[in-house]
Each structure stands twice: as C-alpha cells, then as structure tokens.
Amino acid sequence: MKLENIDKSIQKQDILKGISLEVSPQKLTAFIGPNGAGKSTLLSIMSRLTKKNQGILSIKGREIESWNSQELAQELTILKQKINYQAKLTVEELVSFGRFPYSRGRLKPEDWEKIRETLDYLELTNLKDRYIDSLSGGQLQRVFIAMVLAQDTDFILLDEPLNNLDIKQSVSMMQILKRLVSELGKTIIIVLHDINMASQYADEIVAFKDGQVFCKGTTNQIMQADLLSQLYEIPITLADINGKKICIYS
C-alpha cells in the first residue's frame, strides 16, 4: 500500500497535509501521535470510508478509486474505534458477517468452513453460541477481530482496538495480531496510543503530528527519547528491558 501527498481538509481546516508513506507488506505497522494528529482520519481514507481531497493511494499498484466495493472488501478490512450493534447476535452470527463480500448474505459451505476455522484459530469455538451482549470487553474485541479475520483480506486496519481493554486483554490482543502477521502473512496497520505497546509489538512505526508525518521507520529507529519528546512535547526517557525500549514519562 502506497500513499503519495494525501491531503484532507474539513470546513477549510487542514486535517492531513502531504502524507506520503509506503506500508511494508506482512508487517505490523503502528500509527502513533497526539490526539488530533490525523491518524484515524488517515485510516478511514486508506479504507475509502472517507474521501481524500487530493493525492494518490494505491493498493497492489492500483489506485484505490479503481477498485469496486466488492473487490476492495476482499483485499482490505477496517475495524473502527466505535462499533454500534443493536441486534441480538451470537458470536458465530457476528463472525459470519465477515463473509459478506463473498457470500452477499447467502453463506455457502466454504463460508461456514472459514467461519469455523476462524473461531477455532482465535479460540472462540466454545463461545460461538453466546450472545455478544453477554461477553466481557476482551472477549467481544476478540470476536470483532474474528469477524475481520473471517473476511480473509491481506490488509487489516484497526483503529485503537485496545480502547477499554485492561493490560492483560491488551497484551492478549497484540499477541493475536502478531500471530496474524507471522503465521498468516497479514499486513496490519493499527492506531495505538500506548507507545510501549507499539514498542513491544510493532515492526514499524509511523508518528504523526499536526496532520503530517513526523517520522517513520523501524520500531528501534523511532523509539528514541529525543524524537518522542518532540512528538508528544513532554520529557521522555527510555529504559532497555529485555531488548525492548520502554518509555518513562517525567
């Protein structure tokens, strides 16, 4: 996935300015930065939920506007930060929604097979008949990831999926995402507010500030005290623990 000079403004206010970057395939890339930096807006543009004002966004060498909706939904999926659900659905029913780009609502045997594989992969089979409104926050988020995985796309975009999860649930979620990359070859782009989670689990980091790319590189390149202090405008020092850099806030 490649972005070239992406601009976005809303009511004459610049939200994104000249965003250019290339997402490495089969890696977990974290978007970090202060609130209002444009991370979630860019994720929406990358999934074509929000229109860009100008610039070029291409997936596998094709401009995103040239993909029809069904084609795009078989290549890329996004899980937004806020998901509204009102229907009384079981875990299995919600996961089955991921097959819509293929089944158009008429599930075939191969769709059910993919659903079963996904439930098993994420250890949700024992919960498949539970109603989603009876699940804990961590269980529910795992079910949403299962729905995304059932869609079977190469690109997975996640907007702050750790929100409302405790530390144990957050670690479990990040471990799952790392497995999707290492075992299934997925390309994952995730918006994170916890820099230390990015340090522990991301392969690459793109930092945003004031609607622009502030810096980008491997996790080791970005986890530098001076860069992060400038990014967040607070004093940050780093500690090296078991080969991983951890932020300490002054």
Ranges and model annotations:
Residues 47:
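Helix-to-loop junction immediately C-terminal to a conserved catalytic motif
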Residues 131-135, 139:
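Conserved ABC ATPase signature
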Residues 231-250:
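ABC ATPase nucleotide-binding domains
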Residues 32-34:
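The feature captures the beta-strand-to-loop junction immediately N-terminal to the Walker
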Residues 96, 109-127, 152, 157:
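Conserved ABC ATPase "signature" region
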Residues 55-63, 72:
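Conserved ABC transporter NBD signature motif
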Residues 1-3, 16:
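Conserved structural motif at the start of ABC-family nucleotide-binding domains
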